[in-house]
Design a protein with these regions (language model features):
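GST-like domain detector, emphasizing the conserved glutathione-binding G-site
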Residues: 1-130, 230-246
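Short, contiguous strand/loop micro-motifs
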Residues: 4-6, 186-187, 211
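Short, solvent-exposed turn/loop segments enriched in Gly/Ser/Thr/Pro and often Arg
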Residues: 8, 166, 216
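Active-site-flanking alpha-helical
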Residues: 77, 174-175, 213
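GST-like fold's C-terminal all-alpha helical module
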Residues: 88, 95-205, 244
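Long hydrophobic alpha-helical segments typical of transmembrane helices together
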Residues: 194-246
Length: 246
């Protein structure tokens, strides 16, 4: 059985976190909206009477329909060895994923700080203020936490040690997205987080992920998705920011 992933066809967005898990698991899936007639199918599925999703992404597995990125990953992680078998471990990985989702939402709000219904050009002054605070205070706050997990009780390859989880894949995507959106700022901030940077590189080198990144299935970052690059928002981090935790 091939999974059916429903997400917008031209952006990585939140659907990319699901794609990375499916690719690492090596399971067949169809990116429905990228297929002929797929957008119509996706919109129809969103209007379905049973368990409708508020927005993409959502995943169809047989008769089962699962929405919300972290919820989908919780489901896939248990099925395909991308999460621990015990309840405490599963909840811990889900907790990390939800924290990643918080930072992803804040990254989006740097370019749409007032309203998603407005164009970026309609809120540029506010976006500059939001991005400056995001770079100076918010990224380091979150990165401190991730670095601390990777460093306790001693430095490790992945969040749980030697075993990769969907949260590791999502951290790779988070770092890659922030590097795209804020290359100057991240070049400085990254230096303070060697374990997080190493995890990004380690995930990128995993055979299935490396093959995916080199394929046409991997959509490029662009200015329609969550992580968008605008030169005026890519401000150099404050000298006090970017110190590693742990």
């Amino acid at each position: 059985m091939a999974y059916e992933l429903f997400y917008w066809p031209t952006i990585q967005g939140r659907g990319e976190f699901v794609r990375l898990a499916l690719e690492e698991a090596g399971v067949p899936y169809v990116d429905v909206a990228r297929e002929p007639g797929g957008m119509g199918r996706m919109m129809a599925a969103m209007d379905g009477p049973d368990h409708p999703s508020f927005a993409p992404p959502f995943l169809k597995a047989g008769e089962l329909l699962v929405g919300q990125t972290a919820n989908i990953l919780l489901f896939l992680g248990q099925r395909h060895g991308l999460a621990p078998d015990d309840e405490q471990g599963r909840l811990w990985v889900n907790q990390i994923q939800l924290t990643i989702a918080d930072l992803v939402a804040e990254a989006h709000d740097t370019h749409h700080p007032i309203a998603t219904s407005l164009y970026y050009e309609d809120q540029r002054p506010e976006a500059k203020r939001r991005a400056a605070d995001f770079i100076e205070t918010r990224i380091p706050k979150f990165f401190d936490w991730f670095e601390g997990i990777l460093g306790r009780p001693e430095p490790k390859d992945y969040l749980l040690g030697e075993r990769v989880t969907y949260a590791d894949l999502s951290l790779f995507q988070l770092v890659a997205g922030l590097r795209y959106a804020f290359p100057q700022a991240l070049a400085r901030i990254d230096a303070g987080y060697p374990l997080l940077s190493a995890l990004h590189d380690r995930v990128a080198q995993r055979p299935r992920i490396a093959a995916y990144l080199a394929s046409k299935r991997r959509l490029p970052f662009n200015e329609e998705g969550i992580f968008r690059h605008y030169d005026e928002l890519d401000q150099v981090a404050h000298p006090g920011a970017g110190h590693g935790g742990g």
